[in-house]
Regions:
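Perimembrane helix-loop-helix junctions
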Residues: 5, 9, 208-210, 243-273, ...
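Signature aromatic-anchored transmembrane alpha helix within multi-pass, membrane-resident enzymes
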Residues: 24-31, 165, 172, 220-229, ...
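Membrane-embedded, lumen/periplasm-facing catalytic core of multi-pass transferases
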Residues: 43, 430-491, 504, 526
Length: 599
């Protein structure tokens, strides 16, 4: 029946025809949207890290036609570029040198699609608590769309490798996974990596279909080129994810023979080089390294005071950190241990992880599914190892989380194998599916029933304050002449739409920066003032005459922090007018700022 012409045909079309299928899809879409809105309403609290905010700011810069630049002035970036004879210019933003570009580019695309008037209104309006910043809601919408896309691709991969029930179970498990939702509402770009890895395995599934076909040489080369391009996009989304190219080369070398092998290898290599080449060339031109300053992550480890990545970025030095093999091994083993003991099980797949692991002992009857399971096992090992070694530990996009949809597909496949071998449960497949999805959904149900959160991450981010700091400089006609410095510079850049220097750990770097641009405002948030040493400083009775002993105990900034308590900042410190907004929130103004216009 092409289209119903009578009421009876229409009813039949709705009950058993194509209309019934459309109704089921519409109902599923409505439930998915309703679930998404509920979880987002209760769990969304804006970007939670400087890394995410930095990438959001870079995306906005790309959308504005400013290229891959950032409003965040890292002292390390300033030092590296100055060593290459690029001087600081208050009218020209620094290039972004610490992160892969694909998520910012995706953000730029989402911003560009919005009407300009609406976009500017959302990006400039000060939020009224508990509502959030308009730009944060745009990031949330983007990540929701990416998660829905990942769910559709999960269904498709499960259906093509096994059967529709497997795809439905895996997609449902993804949409009911609390870890997937935590990554989504954190707007850190994890769903983008899910989409890319799922697309890569759909291409691998297509290659399995072509592997035994006659006269498939040209199509094999084309599909391998698509695979190489997708792996290149993974590299541009997360540098360590680019190591999947090793698995792609290994698959092409082992799966094909003779001329087809060389065509497959050439397709992967050519496409990977074409996708990644321009970005690598840009990084080499700016810094001399293929991944720019992200290459330092090999030697850095979050939480290690001697190799803290934040300290490296905020230090005015162009010197690369030395690689200590003992520290590298310790970092790698610690991260792998955390992946295998915790993230693999709590990373989204949960119960299906157990079915996936148990399935290693069982060969699937379908050859392509069996081969791709081992391809994925190799990919899982390579990606976990690469992220553990090459990342500093700051990332929010853990491989164990964005690989979870494929774990779910193979776990669901083995689940139905077990179901079919059980005489009792095999009679009730839908009930068994519902029970498994119910267990998967329990943590998410708990989160969805919580009351609404504040829709921005305070502390330390307060969008209205950051916007007010920019307006203060505008009122004094000091934009560009004086800069802003903050311990959360990406927050100031994203919410305040103004360039901000990152607070250096050394006072001498602070004074060196003031020679390039006088600092008009310094923001100290709970990120700094709630640290244990400041709490200890706050608890001690401090006398003005005792300030000289403070720096030895509390670091170079100790005298400044002590001055916030006593009201007696050092005379040589240029930001001598502190404004106390809360016990752990200060804005220090420079008395040299011009007076407010009109006064």
């Amino acid at each position: 029946m092409n289209s119903p012409r009578t009421a009876q045909e229409f009813i039949h079309w709705l009950e058993v025809g194509a209309g019934a299928r459309w109704l089921r899809w519409a109902a599923l879409a409505a439930v998915t949207v309703a679930l998404s809105l509920r979880v987002a309403w209760t769990q969304f609290h804006g970007p939670t890290s400087e890394i995410t905010l930095l990438q959001a700011d870079t995306g906005r810069q790309v959308m504005r036609g400013e290229g891959f630049t950032t409003l965040v002035n890292f002292p390390q970036t300033a030092a590296v570029l100055e060593a290459r004879r690029v001087k600081f210019d208050p009218g020209q933003a620094y290039p972004e040198l610490h992160h892969a570009p694909l998520y910012p580019l995706t953000i730029a695309g989402a911003l560009w699609l919005l009407p300009e008037g609406s976009r500017e209104k959302w990006m400039s309006a000060a939020p009224v608590p508990p509502d959030g910043f308009g730009g944060d809601y745009i990031l949330l919408g983007l990540n929701l769309v990416l998660l829905w896309t990942a769910a559709l691709l999960t269904y498709r991969l499960g259906r093509r490798l096994f059967e529709p029930r497997v795809g439905a179970l895996a997609a449902g498990a993804l949409l009911l996974s609390v870890a997937s939702w935590q990554a989504t509402v954190a707007v850190n770009g994890t769903p983008l990596l899910m989409v890319l890895i799922l697309a890569a395995f759909l291409v691998w599934q297509r290659l399995e279909e072509l592997a035994g076909a006659e006269l498939a040489g040209g199509r094999l080369a084309a599909w391998n080129a698509v695979l190489g391009g997708l792996v290149g996009l993974l590299f541009l989304a997360e540098y360590s994810a680019g190591t999947l190219v090793v698995v792609a080369f290994g698959y092409s070398a082992l799966r094909f023979r003779g001329r087809e092998r060389w065509l497959a290898l050439a397709g992967v290599a050519t496409a990977f080089a074409l996708v990644t080449g321009p970005w690598i060339a840009r990084n080499v031109a700016l810094t001399g390294h293929p991944v720019a300053l992200a290459g330092h992550n090999l030697a850095l480890k979050a939480g290690d005071p001697t190799a803290e990545p934040t300290t490296m970025r905020t230090t005015l030095s162009a010197t690369a950190p030395p690689v200590d093999l003992r520290k590298l091994a310790n970092k790698t083993l610690t991260s792998l241990q955390e992946d295998l003991k915790s993230r693999m099980w709590a990373g989204g797949a949960m119960w299906l992880t157990a079915f996936f692991v148990a399935g290693w002992l069982y060969p699937f009857r379908a050859g392509p599914a069996n081969r791709l399971r081992w391809v994925f096992t190799a990919a899982l090992g390579v990606l976990l190892l690469a992220q553990a070694a090459l990342n500093s530990g700051e990332t929010e996009r853990h491989a164990a989380v964005w690989l979870a949809p494929i774990v779910m597909v193979f776990g669901a496949g083995f689940f139905f194998v077990l179901l079919g071998s059980n005489a009792l449960l095999g009679l009730w497949p839908r009930a068994a599916m519902a029970a498994l999805l119910g267990l998967q959904a329990l943590p998410l149900a708990h989160d969805a029933l919580e009351p609404r959160r504040l829709h921005f991450q305070y502390p330390p981010y307060f969008p209205s304050l950051f916007q007010g700091m920019r307006l203060e400089l505008q009122r004094r006609e000091a934009i560009g002449r004086f800069g802003i410095m903050a311990d959360v510079p990406a927050g100031v850049a994203w919410y305040g739409r103004e360039r901000a220097w990152a607070l250096p750990p050394r006072l001498r770097d602070f004074y060196a920066i003031t020679l390039q641009q006088p600092i008009g405002e310094l923001l100290l948030t709970p990120r700094t003032l709630d640290r244990p040493f400041f709490s200890e400083l706050n608890a001690r009775p401090i006398l003005p005459g005792a300030l000289s002993a403070v720096p030895n105990r509390f670091g170079e900034w100790g005298e400044i922090y002590a001055g916030l308590l006593t009201g007696a900042l050092p005379r040589e410190f240029p930001l001598a007018a502190p404004q106390k907004l809360a016990e752990n929130l200060y804005v220090l103004l420079n008395p040299a700022l011009p007076p407010v216009r009109g006064k």
